[in-house]
């Protein structure tokens, strides 16, 4: 998939080079072509950090600026660049490729777990010997994702590969009931792309589904208690899970709050 996407970008670059109305300036090579648009802002965050003095429109509203982008991609890629003494554009592509390969492995495990859950009622991410059909189906699902229409972004300097990897790891934590481990993973996800609110909503809906299932199970196993008592017991048993969902939602406000405190404007983000 990476080779195919690189070929597509190379062809697109050649087409753009011959267009009389397009001038890439210093970004006229493949490395520069893969680090355009949003990737330029991530590089600017690495080199200049975020602006304290915001650009304003004629009506006084905040204009488009680097605060629209989360810092995690720039921080990790910048750390790689500083550690190995390489150019930032190379480091961010290396990070994206590594995150994409890791994402493929995590997705494979998630697909295996979902198939085991469907057939056995247990979310087990291990691929068992003799389950070639499940393994094959999971690999085909990963391939479909790797060759999807949006997948070329996974070899650019964008943060999508890193963000989706962290989302997939968050899903794994939720399905395995690792809610303490979920918190740092979800925080990193919220600092990679603005996914804190939908991720928190997912954790909240999962909490609701688990709580309702616990309540139904209690009513089936022992109907001697009142419905209210069983509902309270189910809620109390899943309270930590609910707290995790609320904390994950709160992570969505970390970057906007940082922007507001740093610039003195509540609408900086």
Task: State where each predicted segment sits.
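Membrane-interface transmembrane helices that cradle and orient dolichyl/undecaprenyl
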Residues: 120-121, 125-133, 170-181, 211-213
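Membrane-lumen/periplasm interface segments of specific transmembrane helices
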Residues: 2-18, 34, 200-269
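Short hydrophobic/aromatic helix or loop-helix immediately within or flanking a transmembrane segment
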Residues: 33-55, 59-85
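Specific aromatic-rich, kink-prone transmembrane helix
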Residues: 106, 144-147, 162-181, 203, ...
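Short acidic/glycine- and proline-prone juxtamembrane loop motifs at membrane-interface regions
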Residues: 155-162
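Short helix- or helix-capping micro-motifs
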Residues: 137-148, 186-190
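Transmembrane-helix motifs of polytopic, lipid-linked glycan transferases
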Residues: 78-82, 91-119, 124
């Amino acid at each position: 998939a990476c080779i195919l996407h690189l070929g597509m970008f190379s062809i697109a670059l050649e087409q753009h080079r011959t267009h009389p109305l397009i001038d890439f300036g210093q970004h006229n090579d493949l490395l520069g072509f893969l680090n355009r648009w949003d990737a330029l802002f991530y590089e600017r965050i690495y080199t200049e950090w975020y602006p304290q003095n915001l650009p304003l429109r004629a009506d006084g509203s905040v204009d488009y600026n680097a605060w629209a982008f989360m810092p995690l991609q720039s921080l990790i890629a910048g750390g790689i660049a500083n550690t190995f003494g390489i150019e930032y554009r190379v480091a961010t592509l290396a990070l994206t490729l590594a995150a994409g390969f890791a994402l493929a492995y995590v997705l494979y495990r998630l697909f295996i777990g979902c198939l085991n859950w469907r057939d056995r009622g247990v979310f087990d991410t291990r691929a068992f010997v003799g389950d070639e059909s499940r393994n094959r189906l999971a690999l085909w699902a990963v391939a479909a994702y790797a060759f999807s229409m949006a997948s070329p972004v996974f070899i650019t300097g964008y943060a999508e590969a890193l963000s989706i990897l962290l989302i997939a790891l968050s899903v794994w934590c939720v399905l395995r009931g690792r809610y303490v481990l979920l918190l740092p993973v979800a925080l990193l996800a919220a600092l990679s792309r603005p996914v804190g609110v939908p991720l928190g909503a997912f954790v909240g809906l999962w909490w609701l589904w688990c709580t309702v299932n616990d309540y139904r199970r209690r009513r089936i196993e022992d109907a001697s208690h009142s419905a209210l008592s069983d509902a309270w017991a189910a809620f109390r048993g899943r309270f930590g899970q609910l707290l995790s969902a609320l904390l994950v939602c709160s992570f969505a406000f970390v970057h906007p709050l940082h922007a507001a405190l740093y610039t003195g404007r509540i609408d900086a983000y």
